[in-house]
Structure formats: structure tokens, C-alpha cells
From Swiss-Prot:
Record's protein name: NAD(P)H-quinone oxidoreductase chain 6
Gene Ontology cellular-component terms listed: membrane
InterPro entries assigned: NADH_UbQ/plastoQ_OxRdtase_su6, Nuo/plastoQ_OxRdtase_6_NuoJ
Pfam families listed in its UniProt record: Oxidored_q3 (PF00499)
Underlying gene: ndhG
Reaction(s) catalysed by this chain's protein: a plastoquinone + NADH + (n+1) H(+)(in) = a plastoquinol + NAD(+) + n H(+)(out); a plastoquinone + NADPH + (n+1) H(+)(in) = a plastoquinol + NADP(+) + n H(+)(out)
GO molecular function: NADH dehydrogenase (ubiquinone) activity; quinone binding
Broad class of where this protein is predominantly found: membrane
Lineage of the species this protein comes from: Bacteria, Bacillati, Cyanobacteriota, Cyanophyceae, Synechococcales
Family the UniProt entry places it in: Belongs to the complex I subunit 6 family.
Membrane topology classification: Multi-pass membrane protein
Function in brief: NDH-1 shuttles electrons from NAD(P)H, via FMN and iron-sulfur (Fe-S) centers, to quinones in the respiratory chain. The immediate electron acceptor for the enzyme in this species is believed to be plastoquinone. Couples the redox reaction to proton translocation (for every two electrons transferred, four hydrogen ions are translocated across the cytoplasmic membrane), and thus conserves the redox energy in a proton gradient.
TM annotation in the entry: 9-29, 32-52, 61-81, 100-120, 145-165
KW NAD (keyword) present: yes
Amino acid sequence: MNLAEGVQYISFLILAFLVIGAALGVVLLSNIVYSAFLLGGVFLSISGIYILLNADFVAAAQVLVYVGAVSVLILFAIMLVNKREDFSKIPGRWLRNVSTALVCTGIFALLSTMVLITPWQINETGPFVENTLVTIGKHFFSDYLLPFELASVLLLMAMVGAIILARRDLIPELSEENKTATALTLPERPRELTSASK
């Protein structure tokens, strides 16, 4: 995205404050539905930062995968489960709070050290790519063809496994003598449920 330097700097600051504010809302709000919506806001703000970095494909993938899939999945899970439980006191809670604070402080110190010691100068000699989608597509189908195909096979296996798990409740109970005869057949919906749905 070709913007003036001042506009790009201000846009980055606005998006960074949106990311930090929405992330704090995710972890501090008691209503989990509001937290899920703010998580979608975090993902949208991160995609805006990707657009400022001229990574249009990564920004589109961020919106499609995280906002369109993960946030909607979390909202559906919250609304379908809808189970309210009262908070109960956990023994040794102060020890957990202290250990959590120490871990968070260590991670913050590590990230701050990395930010301070990393050289952030931009190399101007590199070629500027106008359309990153074409370049990523060429790399997918030339240099990274095998990992791309393996990822598609893994996604297909996950989809088949999800379908089998979803249909497991509809498989009828089989007796011991019929198990050996129908071991290699695909599970089908019981006739009672099929006729009832019609």
C-alpha cells in the first residue's frame, strides 16, 4: 500500500492501539461473547497491519481464516454450549497468580530485548513485488509443491474424521455376531431416523 510516510505511521499507530485495546478486552471482560467479538477485532486490526506492509494475500488469509472461521467457530461453540457455572475458589490461587505474573514478566522482558537488539533498517536493494499473490502462487506450485499437497491431504483427513465423529451417534448398535460380517461396510443412517426425517 503506497501511502505517505506520515499517513502510514499514523495508520500503524492507530492499528497497533486497536490491537492492544481489543486484546486487553479479550482477557479482561467477563462476558465471553464480547471477548469473542473483540478477538475478531484483533484479527481485523492485524490484517490492517499486513495491508500496510504490502502483504495483501496474508491480510486476506487473516480475514478469511481467523475472522471468518476461528471467530465464528468460537461464537457458535459459545452459543451452542451455553453452560453457566459459578466460579469456585481454587486452593493455592495466590501461588498460581504469582507464577503467572513471573511468566508474563519474563516473556515481556524477552520480547523487549528482541525489539531493542534487532536491526530494523529496511533493505532498499530488494525488488519490490506489486502483486504478492502471483509470487506466492508460483512458489506454492514450484518450490513448495510437496508441503502444499501434504497440507491439503491433512485437511482432507481432518474433514473426513470430523464427518465420522459427527455421524458416530447415528450408527446403530450391532450384536457380536454381526460385527464380523459388517466390519468392512460403511456406517449408514438407521432406517428409523431416515423415515422419521422424511
